């Protein structure tokens, strides 16, 4: 028999001869994706489960790192020469763009995990040539190793850049732990860089997005879709920065402060730029945007398009940005790369060249810079900063600190000697524990009082879940600590059933008051702790009533925040548009219900099995918002049984959609109505992976495992914001 001569036969897939087979999502693109629940696990982390980054950072000689960063700033490299002999502008841009992906709607993005190292962020058009900044930092990262993460180092480099150019920063906190794989986020619907299919109606930006185009951090510097209209650009700026948790004053300070330093790069034809880092040749070793214009670097650098230097002293802090903005009239022009920008009319050449000390240029601005003059609200702030440079410096220092620390969560997570003493409202402050904590005997007595208070299992579980499940692992906000569920805006959220919530809180506050008044020696219990304890007591009772004795772990130490410590507008972003665990869906939700469930589970840092067991347990405990019976597939509400899974998976029930978008489950033989459910419920029988998980808990021998797994997942959510326990 002749040997096969087909050239494709036997080729090794790692040498280019193989082809990637179709994945499941290629065949079924609408399939619910659970992969997001299992990313950044210990399997992808080379540091090992015992690695404690906080302890490593505490042992770091931070001053030595800062000294090395200072030296780096003026150590110009031939392979990527520094503009004006100083890498400060480049490092500020790197830090800014690392932090600037943050969005308040879901708390995702930001600098907290060093994601700029990975695709797609490392190859976004707006991040062009920041690969060079990170390579500049590599010798320092290599020197200090595990003691400082990439995430911390990138932000610290931006801070040191500012300090090295004469600006006094507000402070710096370490504590950002690196991840080791890219985060799969929804950055927009577009399939091309700089696409803008994210708008509807009168330029209504889709949620949860903040940037105006795919691959941009903020707005298009040439104006909306390249239209050089400063007033129209101001609308984009305001919306984008608001979605990044910045008000108008912070926005003006950040734009003007950042543009006091460095320059943009548009020296030539952008078509001469090579592939981004992810698309570059293997021999380029992760460096992208190789340019065929002149030398490709230095004076020939092409990054975005505009060729703008804002200040006469681009390596020193000054007020030149505002002095130039208001001191000249501006005329529209184009950069050598063909991008819209503005130059000062009838101006002398007072701005230095980045690489030739014999050259000078007239001041230039971006369309989005002029927005700070021609938008009436921004203009008032800008003139105040022009006339009061000290106010400008303070506003920029505070806004920069907020920008670079917004996604780190509460102050208890901050590390290092440079942490500011001042506590800021956007840090969601919670008082430090100021009393003796309850002991096991106290806890047992309080549980008995709670269960004898007349509150039902459903009411106690619902309240504890509502309090704790606001936690977002993305920006470390929310959670049960602080008991903000009793404060505006959370006490009035529809999903929290305000009338029922008020009743539960009133009775728990009475128990709290009676207990605290009877104590000596400074012992107390906070309402935050009591809310969680009530939920734990209810879960124990529900399990006991279902035939399983279990102790739900409870660790006191939460405190109660005040209304004055709570930024109402900021906390509105945490209001659930959907909570599949409570079968709640508002009219403002922008995902399919089952997608929203997975999204919330990911924010809670739950795995697919944890999501499954929690939902099934909460259904039979009667924790649905509004008392809805949808998905309550049991005749024993309030008992922690596996009935949800048993009744969902039985073939005795046939499900049919009805007009309101929900489903009826009828007996196959008699057509008798047995249950009502939503897509969030039925997905656990329809989705093959979720059905496999549901089957585990529907088995005849699974009741005890179901209870134990539910308790473990419940405890994880109750303690999600207990950074003091980590």
Curated annotation (Swiss-Prot):
Q: Which gene encodes it?
A: katG
Q: Which residues are named in the active-site annotation?
A: 97
Q: What is its EC number?
A: 1.11.1.21
Sites where the protein binds heme b: 259
Enter cross-link residues for Tryptophyl-tyrosyl-methioninium (Trp-Tyr) (with M-244): 96-218
This chain belongs to the protein called Catalase-peroxidase
Which Gene3D superfamilies does the record cross-reference, listed alphabetically?
1.10.520.10, Peroxidase, domain 2
Q: Positions of the region Disordered?
A: 1-25
Modification note: Formation of the three residue Trp-Tyr-Met cross-link is important for the catalase, but not the peroxidase activity of the enzyme.
């Amino acid at each position: 028999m002749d040997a096969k001569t087909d050239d494709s036969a036997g080729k090794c897939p790692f040498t280019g001869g193989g082809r990637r087979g179709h994945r499941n999502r290629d065949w079924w693109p609408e399939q619910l994706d659970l992969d997001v629940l299992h990313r950044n696990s210990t399997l992808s982390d080379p540091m090992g489960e015992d690695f404690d980054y906080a302890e490593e950072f505490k042992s770091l000689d931070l001053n030595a790192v800062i000294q090395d960063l200072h030296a780096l700033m003026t150590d110009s490299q031939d392979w990527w020469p520094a503009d004006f002999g100083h890498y400060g502008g480049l490092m500020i841009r790197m830090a800014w763009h690392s932090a600037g992906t943050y969005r308040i709607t879901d708390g995702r993005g930001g600098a907290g995990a060093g994601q700029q190292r990975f695709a797609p962020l490392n190859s976004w058009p707006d991040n062009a040539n920041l690969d060079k900044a990170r390579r500049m930092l590599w010798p320092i990262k290599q020197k200090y190793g595990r003691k400082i993460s990439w995430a911390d180092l990138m932000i610290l480099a931006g801070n040191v850049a500012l300090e090295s150019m004469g600006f006094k920063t507000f402070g710096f906190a370490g504590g950002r732990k690196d991840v080791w794989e890219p985060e799969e986020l929804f950055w927009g619907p577009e399939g091309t860089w700089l696409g803008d299919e994210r708008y509807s109606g009168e330029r209504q930006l889709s949620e949860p997005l903040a940037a105006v185009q795919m691959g941009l951090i903020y707005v298009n510097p040439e104006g909306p879709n390249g239209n050089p209209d400063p007033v129209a650009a101001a609308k984009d700026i305001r919306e984008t920065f608001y979605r990044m948790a910045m008000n108008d004053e912070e926005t003006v300070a950040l734009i003007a402060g950042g543009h006091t330093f460095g320059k943009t790069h548009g020296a030539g034809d952008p078509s001469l730029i090579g592939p981004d880092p992810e698309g570059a040749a293997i021999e380029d070793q992760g460096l992208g945007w190789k340019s065929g214009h002149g030398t490709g670097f230095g004076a020939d650098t092409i990054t975005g398009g505009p060729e703008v230097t804002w200040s006469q002293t681009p390596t020193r802090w000054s007020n030149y940005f505002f002095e130039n903005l208001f001191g000249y009239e501006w005329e529209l022009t184009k950069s050598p790369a063909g991008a819209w920008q503005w130059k000062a009319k009838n101006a002398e050449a007072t701005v230095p060249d980045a690489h030739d000390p014999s050259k000078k240029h007239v001041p230039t601005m971006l369309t989005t810079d002029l927005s700070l003059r021609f938008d009436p609200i921004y203009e008032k702030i800008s003139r105040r900063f022009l006339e009061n440079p000290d106010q400008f410096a303070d506003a920029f220092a505070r806004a920069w600190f907020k920008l670079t620390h917004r996604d780190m969560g509460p102050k208890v997570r901050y590390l290092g000697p440079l942490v500011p003493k001042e506590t800021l409202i956007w840090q969601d402050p919670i008082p430090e524990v100021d009393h003796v904590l309850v002991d096991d005997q106290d806890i047992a007595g309080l549980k008995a009082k709670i269960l004898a208070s007349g509150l039902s299992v459903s009411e106690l579980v619902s309240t504890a879940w509502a309090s704790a499940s606001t936690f977002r692992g993305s920006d470390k906000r929310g959670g049960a600590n602080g008991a903000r569920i009793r404060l505006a805006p959370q006490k009035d959220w529809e999903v929290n059933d305000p009338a029922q919530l008020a009743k539960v809180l009133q009775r728990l506050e009475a128990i709290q008051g009676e207990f605290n008044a009877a104590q000596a020696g400074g012992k107390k219990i906070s309402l935050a702790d009591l809310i969680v304890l009530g939920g734990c007591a209810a879960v124990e009772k529900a399990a006991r009533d279902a035939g399983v004795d279990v102790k739900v772990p409870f660790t006191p130490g939460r405190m109660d925040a005040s209304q004055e410590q709570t930024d109402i507008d900021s906390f509105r972003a945490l209001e659930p548009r959907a909570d599949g665990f409570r079968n709640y869906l508002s009219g403002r939700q922008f995902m399919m219900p089952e997608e929203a469930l997975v999204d919330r589970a990911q924010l809670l840092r739950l795995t697919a099995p944890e999501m499954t067991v929690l939902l099934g347990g909460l259904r039979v405990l009667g924790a649905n918002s509004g008392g809805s019976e949808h998905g309550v597939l049991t005749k024993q509400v309030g008992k922690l049984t596996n009935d949800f899974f048993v009744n969902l998976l039985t073939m005795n029930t046939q499900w049919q959609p009805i007009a309101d978008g929900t489903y009826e489950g009828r007996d196959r033989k008699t057509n008798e109505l047995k249950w009502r459910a939503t897509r969030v419920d039925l997905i656990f029988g329809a989705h093959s992976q979720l059905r496999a998980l549901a089957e585990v808990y529907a088995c005849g021998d699974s009741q005890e495992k179901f209870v134990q797994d539910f308790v473990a997942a419940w405890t994880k959510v109750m303690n999600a914001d207990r950074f003091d326990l980590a």
